[in-house]
Amino acid sequence: MNTADKRLDEILLAEPRGFCAGVDRAIEIVERALTKFGAPIYVRHEIVHNTYVVNELKAKGAIFIEELSDVPPGATLVFSAHGVSKAIQDEARARGFQIFDATCPLVTKVHVEVAKLHKEGYEFIMIGHKGHPEVEGTMGQLDSGIHLVEDVADVARITPSQTERLAVVTQTTLSVDDAAEISAAVKARFPQVREPKQQDICYATQNRQDAVKVLSPQVDILIVVGSPTSSNSNRLRELAAKLGTEAYMVDDASELRESWFEGKSRVGLTAGASAPEILVKQVIDRIRALGAVSVRKMDGIEETIKFPLPKGLKVDAQGHMLDVGDSQLHQLT
């Protein structure tokens, strides 16, 4: 069949897609803080990088700030899922805020490893994107001794003060393949470097990228639901494009362009780890309106991981125990 003669037929859904355990936990922390203490609740940085999620929480009474000086004395403050530096933690405590830490436990694992190895005299090479809040939080665990590399070329430029005790850590939301390539370059220059006991890139990032690798060759176009600030969503689009599939990232269904689907039969659809399923369903509805007949979910890994909530948020304002489950935003369908 001529490409021009192709008509929209089928939507293939990546599995898994959308919310991960760390995002679900972070959103639920804000929701429960609002339930227990009432609005406003202050959140340093966007709780997760998704426009819809942030706007929904704003409507419930969350106020998102970057500077702690914008938070009134005695207020309740939540740290975002990306983590914060030691300096931010210390300042928040000094200002007397009631603090709930929504840092993803997998990011916290990296922070703990950095602190442990630093005491043993290690310097660090961090693979990540300059300016990303997770990178700033991890590098801010120490006053010095962490060298950021964004690509292979950066590996040749860094100048650790010693190489006998050197360890690698990575941003959790990177491209798995890119991180492996940079890690190999680090190992080639510093053969004795200590690599992570377990890969820092999180299970959800790995699973969503693996799903795109399976999905991309089977479709004519791939749509990623995610906000521009979402690192892991951007990596999904880049991965599909690298595999030779036309790929676009949209914040929501309103950003879809009819021209993208001309001459296309099969549409692949996935979502970054901070994008709620309601946005995926809206995109499906829009693509159906353009002519797609069926929707099929691909086989994939079922994620069952749940991260515990802070103890102070397992009860409501009256001291009644709250059920631990998915956030309200996760339940939206």
Curated annotation (Swiss-Prot):
GO terms for biological process: dimethylallyl diphosphate biosynthetic process; isopentenyl diphosphate biosynthetic process, methylerythritol 4-phosphate pathway; terpenoid biosynthetic process. It comes from the Bacteria. [4Fe-4S] cluster binds at residues 20, 104, 202. Pathway: Isoprenoid biosynthesis; dimethylallyl diphosphate biosynthesis; dimethylallyl diphosphate from (2E)-4-hydroxy-3-methylbutenyl diphosphate: step 1/1; Isoprenoid biosynthesis; isopentenyl diphosphate biosynthesis via DXP pathway; isopentenyl diphosphate from 1-deoxy-D-xylulose 5-phosphate: step 6/6. One of its GO terms (molecular function) is 4-hydroxy-3-methylbut-2-enyl diphosphate reductase activity. Isopentenyl diphosphate binds at residues 49, 82, 132, 230-232, 274. Its cofactor is [4Fe-4S] cluster. Dimethylallyl diphosphate binds at residues 49, 82, 132, 230-232, 274. Binds 1 [4Fe-4S] cluster per subunit. Its EC number is 1.17.7.4. Gene3D superfamilies: 3.40.50.11270, 4-hydroxy-3-methylbut-2-enyl diphosphate reductase, catalytic domain (3.40.1010.20). InterPro entries: LytB/IspH. Keywords: 4Fe-4S, Iron, Iron-sulfur, Isoprene biosynthesis, Metal-binding, Oxidoreductase. The active site is at 134 (proton donor). It catalyses: isopentenyl diphosphate + 2 oxidized [2Fe-2S]-[ferredoxin] + H2O = (2E)-4-hydroxy-3-methylbut-2-enyl diphosphate + 2 reduced [2Fe-2S]-[ferredoxin] + 2 H(+); dimethylallyl diphosphate + 2 oxidized [2Fe-2S]-[ferredoxin] + H2O = (2E)-4-hydroxy-3-methylbut-2-enyl diphosphate + 2 reduced [2Fe-2S]-[ferredoxin] + 2 H(+). Pfam families: LYTB. (2E)-4-hydroxy-3-methylbut-2-enyl diphosphate binds at residues 49, 82, 132, 172, 230-232, 274. Belongs to the IspH family. PANTHER family: 4-HYDROXY-3-METHYLBUT-2-ENYL DIPHOSPHATE REDUCTASE. Catalyzes the conversion of 1-hydroxy-2-methyl-2-(E)-butenyl 4-diphosphate (HMBPP) into a mixture of isopentenyl diphosphate (IPP) and dimethylallyl diphosphate (DMAPP). Acts in the terminal step of the DOXP/MEP pathway for isoprenoid precursor biosynthesis. This is 4-hydroxy-3-methylbut-2-enyl diphosphate reductase. It comes from Polaromonas sp. (strain JS666 / ATCC BAA-500).
